[in-house]
């Protein structure tokens, strides 16, 4: 969607990604030029990645990394961006914002780094937030806190959230509508109630069967094994 794969050898071979941009109107992101994409990334579409330690730059302070998008997209001065950065750190419930803004990523815990990523992603109040497995690397207590923050900010800022996850427990908490993907293709779509109460595709049922249930010790058969790579008859 954000065309980040362009920089790692990826290529979009067919299809469209239609987006209603506040600045450029309706456009197809697959054919948008670099200037248009640069104005949209981080401004109208933002992303929270799975592992914040590899997403944050280790040689810049937390405050500088949040302020960067505010200066670039919002036209703020350095002083204005600093003030807004501190407000964002408070909004994601990080204490001692002044000290944290001058800290480097390695000095923060995993949960704190992910809160910084949320603050950075929502700094320009995007219309779409893509959350790619944002809680997978966190323990369940921190996971619940992060999900609650995303939900509250989504409501307060009126931001649409595309949540990518394999955890159906998270889907039940966060989603209104669900699209189930299998082997890169959409196999089922519906409201969260339809998916959970009347799943149609075997893969959807397998995902739901993987959710732990209190008092249940009965195992479920594994889904059909899918090869990752086939090389001259050898399956990996």
Regions found by a protein language model. Give the residues of each.
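Conserved ABC ATPase "signature" region
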Residues: 16-28, 80-99, 208-209
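ABC ATPase NBD coupling module
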Residues: 24-46, 64, 72, 194-199
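Charged, flexible cofactor/metal-binding loops and thiol motifs
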Residues: 26, 192-236
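A short, proline-enriched helix->beta-strand linker immediately N-terminal to the Walker B motif
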Residues: 123-127
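A short, surface-exposed alpha-helical micro-motif characterized by mixed small hydrophobic
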Residues: 171-173
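Short, glycine/charged-rich "phosphate-handling" switch motifs in NTP-dependent
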Residues: 177, 189
């Amino acid at each position: 969607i954000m065309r980040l794969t362009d920089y790692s050898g990826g290529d979009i071979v067919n299809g469209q990604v239609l987006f209603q941009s506040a600045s450029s109107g309706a456009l197809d992101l697959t054919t948008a030029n670099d200037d248009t994409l640069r104005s949209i990334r981080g401004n109208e579409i933002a992303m929270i990645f799975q592992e914040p330690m590899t997403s944050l730059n280790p040689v810049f302070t937390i405050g500088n990394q949040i302020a960067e998008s505010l200066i670039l997209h919002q036209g703020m001065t350095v002083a204005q961006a600093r003030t807004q950065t501190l407000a964002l750190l408070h909004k994601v419930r990080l204490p001692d914002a002044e000290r944290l803004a001058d800290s480097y990523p390695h000095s923060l815990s995993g949960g704190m780094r992910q809160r910084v990523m949320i603050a950075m992603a929502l700094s320009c109040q995007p219309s779409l937030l893509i959350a790619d497995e944002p809680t997978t690397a966190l323990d369940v207590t921190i996971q619940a806190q992060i999900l609650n923050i995303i939900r509250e900010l989504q409501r307060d800022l009126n931001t649409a959230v595309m949540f990518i996850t394999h955890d159906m427990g998270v889907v039940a908490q966060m989603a209104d509508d669900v699209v189930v993907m299998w082997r890169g293709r959409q196999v089922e779509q519906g409201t969260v109630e339809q998916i959970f109460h009347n799943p149609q595709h075997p893969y959807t049922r397998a995902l739901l069967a993987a959710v732990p249930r209190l008092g249940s010790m009965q195992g479920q058969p594994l889904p059909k094994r899918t090869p990752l790579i086939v090389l001259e008859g050898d399956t990996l």
